[in-house]
Amino acid sequence: MKMVMAIIKPFKLEEVRDALSEKGVQGLTVTEVKGYGRQKGHTELYRGAEYIVDFLPKVKIEIVVSDEDLDKAVESIQNAAKTGRIGDGKIFVTNLEQVVRIRTGEDGEKAL
């Protein structure tokens, strides 16, 4: 099993969710986050004063998939989140030792 975490632009969330759903990926966790990378920040004017906005709003999604479903999940996220501009985000994949469904006690891939 794999944990897939992606940091994407907020306006791409619905497209990513729909793309994952089409591939049979059920359930994801969404967290609003802020960050910066190559995109860096920008300057804004507020009441005549300049402010540097270093951290930009992003969305972090987390899904757990079987090893067999990993490639299609990553590809779905990448294709749906891509705009071709700096700041599109990143996808991280890690091994997952164990999953337990709290309600039933099922574990492993049965809990997905």
Map each language-model feature to its residues.
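Positively charged, small/polar-rich N-terminal and surface patches that mediate targeting and assembly
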Residues: 1-112
